[in-house]
Amino acid sequence: MPGSTGQPDAGGAGTGTTAGDPGHPHPALAGAEDAAPRPPPEPDDAAAALRLALDQLSALGLGGARPGDEGMATRSADGATECGEDEPAPPDELEVAVAPPVTASVAPGGLPLLDPDVSPRPSPPDVFASFAPHPAALGPSTLLAEQLNVIGSRKKSVNMTECVPVPSSEHVAEIVGRQGCKIKALRAKTNTYIKTPVRGEEPVFIVTGRKEDVEMAKREILSAEHFSLIRATRSKAGGLSGATPGPPNLPGQTTIQVRVPYRVVGLVVGPKGATIKRIQQRTHTYIVTPGRDKEPVFAVTGMPENVDRAREEIEAHITLRTGAFTDSGPDSDFHANGTDVCLDLLGAAASLWAKAPHPGRRPPAATGGLRGDNALGAASTPEPFYVGSRGGPPLPDPSPSSPYGGSGNGGFTFGGDGPSAPTGTATPEDCDFGFDFLALDLTVPATATIWAPFERAAPLPAFSGCPAVNGAPAQPNTGTRRSSGGGAATTPRHSPTLPEPGGLSLELPLARRSVPDPVGAVPWRPPQSALPPFSGSTTFSTTPSLPSTTLASSTLDTVPSEGNHKPSTTAANSSASTAAPGPPSAALARECVVCSEGEAMAALVPCGHNLFCMDCAVRICGKSEPECPACRTPATQAIHIFS
């Protein structure tokens, strides 16, 4: 172009070129003509226009197709920035700078995006190949066949029917329940229909439902059968006087009898049977309660270990509520371990607790000398309750004899000093009896015992046959114990003698215990007239008092001799005859051994020592480590004794 080759200066060349060649057919001249009268664009406007064009090109996918135009546009933008205001842009450069945006915005031309050669359009099957076909495309036959199979299988399982026979109509009544409550619950639980047999028909249940539901209902009916068997046997047995036959066809289960006193049957059953039901649920057993006109025997059925647990819970409940222990039969644990049931609680009702002697136990005559049964001329029935210890009338026959009430003196003679006491030496097993805790533990300091207020400076006249108590030197213990009598003078005695011309008697509360525990001292009750009441003074010069642990130098088992000090049996018998039992009076009320103020009316469980007032017993049980002050046995509860 001639206008663009020779331009003497920027202003004149630009003007002359545009005016001298107005009709130039090239489209660039028209653009230059339009741009000539306008002022040169600012650098910011040019950059913005270029950025807009690049955005449009990139949106249309043409950014990579024309890299040369982009470079030229960039260079023209740089040149326009360098020109400034004094030197307008040349027409050629202006044409190059403006041409791409005009071309892009006005005439985009053929779009390469729609060109099949550049990017071919994918077919629809390729796009939706990853999706599963619509179920309708599979045809109605497949769906219909599947639904028919499901319905057919369900229809087959619903039509399951099975007959469940039971032995008798008593079982039907037990399984159906009162007003059908049990069978309704079983229907709802198993989702089945159970047809109960009509009275007079065969006792067969008809169960309809799915197979697994029918099996579950059958198991439920048969699992409840053993309870109904027991009830049916009970109704036909005619009472519990003999051995109650156990339920048949129940392998591994056993039935035992738990005999209790008449007066505690209602206590074991509880209000509306709540107690016995709780024991049944806790031990997984079935317990048949005795009728009002039957023997007081509970029939417990279940697995052997569960039956034993139920028996223990029944005995524990009686012990907890009454403070007394049960010896339910000859196979009782308390028979086997040789301990006594010796709580002074039940009064004349103690005859209910008597029992036949166990054939496997040692003969009771061997222990009569130490316990005083033979010495008092009474029958040798083991393990009675000693209810005559409060001076009450002796028990009528055939109640078990009591060494406290059998001789009529309301007291007890240690060591069997009566005329019928056997002489000689007995084995330690024969000498084992309910007073093992009389072995005194003299190693306990005086401040650690509750008997410190009753210490004496003078020797105790009542223990004249015990040189160890009176301060005489004691010989080492030979390890044997004698039963009674004047023979074998050098044999150490197990317990002290208490003869007194005025009729010395005492009351010694006994307790069941597992092992003989040594104690700091033993509470003895003074006689009605021989000993004064305890006032807390520590010196008694003329009257006998309680023994103190600080007076003796060794245990009472180490007494060397008693030939000169032992009184005659005549004196013992005369003392027995002078203190005949009379009606209980206020003078017989015992004082609490802890506070010496309140009346002893509370006992500790499980040892059974009734030596405390209620306040002291509650205070003992409230300690962090509660224990009985007399036997050091852990105490679990304090009970109030009404005698």
Curated annotation (Swiss-Prot):
Compartments (UniProt record): Cytoplasm; Nucleus
Gene: Mex3d
Pfam families: KH_1, zf-C3HC4_3
First and last residue of the signal peptide: none
Compositional bias segments (type: Acidic residues): 83-92
Residue positions, PTM Phosphothreonine: T491
Protein name: RNA-binding protein MEX3D
One of the record's GO cellular component terms: nucleus
Composition-biased stretches (Gly residues): 405-418
Role summary: RNA binding protein, may be involved in post-transcriptional regulatory mechanisms.
Comp. bias regions, Low complexity: 18-34, 495-505, 531-556, 567-583
Family matches, as InterPro entries: KH-I_MEX3_rpt1, KH-I_MEX3_rpt2, KH_dom, KH_dom_type_1, KH_dom_type_1_sf, MEX3, Znf_RING, Znf_RING/FYVE/PHD
Biological processes per GO annotation: mRNA catabolic process; mRNA destabilization; RNA destabilization
Highest taxon of source: Eukaryota
Organism: Mus musculus
Residue ranges, annotated region (Disordered): 1-48, 61-92, 357-427, 471-505, 519-583
Gene Ontology MF terms: mRNA 3'-UTR AU-rich region binding; mRNA 3'-UTR binding; zinc ion binding
Residues that bear Phosphoserine: S495
KH domain residues: 160-221, 253-314
ZnF segments: RING-type: 592-632
